[in-house]
Amino acid sequence: MSVDENQLENGQLLSSENEASSPFKESIPSRSSLYLIALTVSLLGVQLTWSVELGYGTPYLFSLGLRKEWTSIIWIAGPLTGILIQPIAGILSDRVNSRIGRRRPFMLCASLLGTFSLFLMGWAPDICLFIFSNEVLMKRVTIVLATISIYLLDVAVNVVMASTRSLIVDSVRSDQQHEANSWAGRMIGVGNVLGYLLGYLPLYRIFSFLNFTQLQVFCVLASISLVLTVTITTIFVSERRFPPVEHEKSVAGEIFEFFTTMRQSITALPFTLKRICFVQFFAYFGWFPFLFYITTYVGILYLRHAPKGHEEDWDMATRQGSFALLLFAIISLAANTALPLLLEDTEDDEEDESSDASNNEYNIQERNDLGNIRTGTNTPRLGNLSETTSFRSENEPSRRRLLPSSRSIMTTISSKVQIKGLTLPILWLSSHVLFGVCMLSTIFLQTSWQAQAMVAICGLSWACTLWIPYSLFSSEIGKLGLRESSGKMIGVHNVFISAPQVLSTIIATIVFIQSEGSHRDIADNSIAWVLRIGGISAFLAAYQCRHLLPINF
């Protein structure tokens, strides 16, 4: 359904009574920490798997003889699959009502696809060497197979990631969404630490009896972790059963409508969700080049000052980059554990402050048609929605609050270390500023250890990126009563994460082509300039984030 002007002007209020009467509105029990760990542990496997691509992808492609501008084009696989695959997976899983649930079948299939793609990535040169005798043809086919493996791996990662995020929204109460997403951030942090630690260790020596290369051992370990963690989530987490609905459109029709009415879907988002998406757009424009090129950047600085005889030692340079990412992951994991405890718990002040919110410019009356988010004709009427959206909502648990009061130990610790006035939006804004400063600092960096220190500091910002936007977004979905369409809603959110990465890739390609025109030395400064452009985008994300600040900030 498209958004029409009359519908926007004559919307009806989605009241708490309507939400309560919805057949999708059912009681969700309070979830224990063990349940949340089982729910989010699949993200650990996903991140460890993705660390293969992040830590070794670019150096691996360089080792195959690929030039930088071509590697940037290949890395467009990630955002493209994010734009296409996550919404499709969300729409399909929203419609599934199988015995084992809506999300878990997709997670299991994607984990098997990820295992196959890792095998293809690690053994592509060996496969081509076995089949082809012509060296030139062998190299070309190896590059093709490596590219296919990267695309398949991105599809698998996106499906598991989207399904897990939707499962969090489906299975956890609104007042526990922050805690659940904090656990998700921790799992991603642990996956990062393990992944980059494995990338730094000489795996080919540790597992010398296998006679595998470093990348091949890494791919085997990543495959095991992906299948194991997804299996744990599938076994120990039960999904909610939603009432069956009669869909007025086919699956293909709904997918086609999603992409053709993307603009209307974005326009129909409530104020807070829309602002979160805008922040994510500029944030990921900056993060994408960092994640894919920082290993190479650190390696370049290492080679510039490498000991005599090691000037072309790209294996050691890659390990130096992996060590930087290991520090990055450790700081990120520590921050994901500590930062939530520093947030101010404003529940006691919520009622007093909410009365002032109605007079604030960010307390906005919106009339949105959410028909394009419905799952079928029997879905509770969500079209013609008029809602009063305030970042502080009366009679709702604080969306900045992380831990339920039942977690007495953690609440006690948090009460001792809380920073007055520190809320999720303020912390998120600060993280963008910090990341932007770090990227611009590449102007002054000269050695690999300086770059490693800078990368480690960025772990603070990455911790916030993995946790805060998802906490705000999923909590808002729950409060709006849109859980039955959470897969599609998260698909819209992911478009704002993936689209800027495509744009960032195009800009990086232009920068690389210009640098190749002047000289073909791989150790030029073009990657540093791509990182600096990302830093400028981080400041734009901070500017957009101001709309989410507390009303008295």
From Swiss-Prot:
- Residues annotated as transmembrane: 34-54, 73-93, 112-132, 141-161, 187-207, 217-237, 281-301, 323-343, 425-445, 453-473, 495-515, 522-542
Compartments, as annotated in UniProt: Membrane
UniProt region (Disordered), positions on chain: 1-26, 368-399
Q: CDD domains recorded for this chain? A: MFS_SLC45_SUC (cd17313)
Q: Keywords for this entry?
A: Membrane, Sugar transport, Symport, Transmembrane, Transmembrane helix, Transport
Which residues lie toward the Cytoplasmic compartment? 1-33, 94-111, 162-186, 238-280, 344-424, 474-494, 543-553
Which Gene Ontology biological process is one annotated for this entry?
A: sucrose import across plasma membrane
Give the source's domain of life in one word. Eukaryota
Point to the regions of Polar residues compositional bias.
Answer: 1-21, 374-392
Record flagged with keyword Calcium? no
Q: Which GO terms describe its molecular function?
A: maltose:proton symporter activity; sucrose:proton symporter activity
Segments in the Extracellular topological domain: 55-72, 133-140, 208-216, 302-322, 446-452, 516-521
Q: Does the keyword field hold tRNA processing?
A: no
> What does it do?
Responsible for the transport of maltose and sucrose into the cell, with the concomitant uptake of protons (symport system).
Protein known as: General alpha-glucoside permease
Which species does the entry assign this protein to? Schizosaccharomyces pombe (strain 972 / ATCC 24843) (Fission yeast)
